[in-house]
Curated annotation (Swiss-Prot):
GO terms for molecular function: magnesium ion binding; methylisocitrate lyase activity; oxaloacetate decarboxylase activity. Its cofactor is Mg(2+). Its EC number is 4.1.1.112. Coiled coil: none annotated. This is Oxaloacetate decarboxylase 1. It comes from the Bacteria. The keyword Nucleotide-binding does not apply.
Amino acid sequence: MPKASHQDLRFAFRELLASGSCYHTASVFDPMSARIAADLGFEVGILGGSVASLQVLAAPDFALITLSEFVEQATRIGRVAQLPVLADADHGYGNALNVMRTVIELERAGVAALTIEDTLLPAQFGRKSTDLIPVEEGVGKIRAALEARVDSSLSIIARTNAGVLSTEEIIVRTQSYQKAGADAICMVGVKDFEQLEQIAGHLSVPLMLVTYANPNLHDDERLARLGVRIVVDGHAAYFAAIKATYDCLRLQRGQQNKSENLTATELSHTYTQPEDYIRWAKEYMSVDE
C-alpha cells in the first residue's frame, strides 16, 4: 500500500471535519503508538501536550516542555504516521509571534492539525493557573497561526476552557475565534449537553471536545448532530503503557508478591511528583491553583 503524504493526511483530517460523524482520537505519543493506532483503524490520533511532557521530561503538565522538544517528538511520529495526527500545541509557546514559529515547525513535522489555546501559559506570578488571556490576544494568536501556515490544508483549531467562564463568555470567545478564521473550535470543560447546545447554536465551524470521558456527554450521535467531529476522551493508552512498564519491571525484580500495586494514575503521580511543582509555583510565583 502506498504511503500517505503529510498533505494526504491533512486532507483526510479535513474530511473528518466536513463529515457528519463524531470521531474519537487515539493517544499517539511515539512512532510505535502511531503505527498501532493506524493499524487498528483509528481515523485520527492526538499528541497531547501533557503526554509529551510525561514522555519527554517525566514531568507533569505545567507547560515545562519547550517548543523544540515538542516538535522533535511530533517529527518522530510524523515520519511513520499513516493516520492524521493532531498536535496539542498548548498556548503556541508564547505570544502571537511565537505561535507563528510553532505553526511553521509543526507543519514541517507533518502534523495534520494543531490546537492553540487561550489559557494564560506558563503560569504567571500572582495569577490563577486557569486564567485565560484576553479574547483580543487569543484572536491575534489565531490570525497569526493562519498567516504562518504554508500548506492551507493544515487545520488550525482554536481551543478554550468552557469550565472557567460563564457560557455567555465562552460564546463570545468561540464566536471571535470563528470570525478570526479558525478551522474548528476545541473546548475543554463542557459540563453537559445543555451547555454544549447553547454554545453550538452560535457556531458554524466544526467542534472538538476534550471530555476526559465525561459521562454526561456519552452520545456520539447527539454530539455529531451538534457539530462535534473530534472527541478526546483522554490518554488511556499512554497511562496503560506506564502501568505495563511498571508491572513488567516489578515482576523482573521479583517484587510481584508485594502488597503495593499502584494504579496508572498513582504511578504517574509518583514518578512526576506534581506536588513539588505546585509548591514551587506557590512559593516563588504566588500562583493560586
